[in-house]
A protein has these predicted regions:
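A short alpha/beta connector and helix-capping loop motif
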Residues: 178-194
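Binuclear metal-dependent hydrolase catalytic cores
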Residues: 1-169, 178-182
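Conserved small/polar residues in nucleotide/adenosyl-binding loops
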Residues: 196-199
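Anionic-ligand binding region
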Residues: 173
Length: 199
């Protein structure tokens, strides 16, 4: 599987949430401070970023990590998962970075960041490009196998990922089709976030 570093595991607003007076948000315990969801995976042959939210710059400064990113797996187009894509600029020094997402998310990214996805980009923009993927269709980042899985975030269909055959990564899950459960069998590690509580 390699090494997975959780860069952020907070809610869409981060923790603490501005204006919240609950015990967690007013806590002085540093463990109660969480940046928005993102992870960095090192496999045998690839460095893969999973989601790239608005805290990405701070996450990478904290991680002291500046290396080639071979691909970014995007789960969905919500700002807390893509708001940091512009901060990939310095990483373009190594190579152009593929952004893997479903067609729906790719369309939203093209509309939000048109300056990145045109034939002739001007200097200084992130060196990123979109690669559309489909749930259930395997692709590779270098030699690392990636299987996108269908997940439901409320009524919004999003992607989870099975990476390298041994790691599952699913965020903002409300429901998941039976076929996605089947595709997760045999994992060593499953990282999941569910925003609803059943009790």
């Amino acid at each position: 599987m390699g090494k997975l570093r959780i860069l952020g595991s907070g809610t869409s607003t981060g923790v603490p949430e501005i204006g919240c007076t609950c015990p967690v948000c007013t806590s002085t315990d540093p463990r109660d401070n969480r940046l928005r969801a993102s992870s960095l995976l090192h496999t045998d042959d690839a460095v893969i970023l999973i989601d790239c939210g608005p805290d990405f710059r701070e996450q990478m400064l904290r991680a002291s990590s500046f290396e080639k990113i071979d691909g970014v797996l995007v789960t969905h187009e919500h700002y807390d998962h893509v708001g940091g894509l512009d901060d990939l600029r310095p990483f373009g020094r190594f190579a152009d970075i593929p952004i893997y997402s479903d067609a729906y998310t790719a369309a939203h990214l093209r509309a939000r960041m048109p300056y990145c996805f045109v034939d002739k980009v001007y200097p200084g923009v992130p060196r990123i490009y979109l690669q559309e993927v489909e749930a259930g269709q395997v692709f590779h980042i270098n030699r690392t196998e990636v299987l996108p899985l269908r997940v439901m975030h409320g009524r919004l269909p999003i992607l989870g990922y099975r990476i390298g055959g041994r790691l599952g990564y699913i965020t903002d899950m409300h429901l998941m089709p039976e076929e996605s459960y089947e595709q997760l069998k045999g994992l060593d590690v499953l990282v999941t976030v569910s925003y609803t509580h059943l009790t």
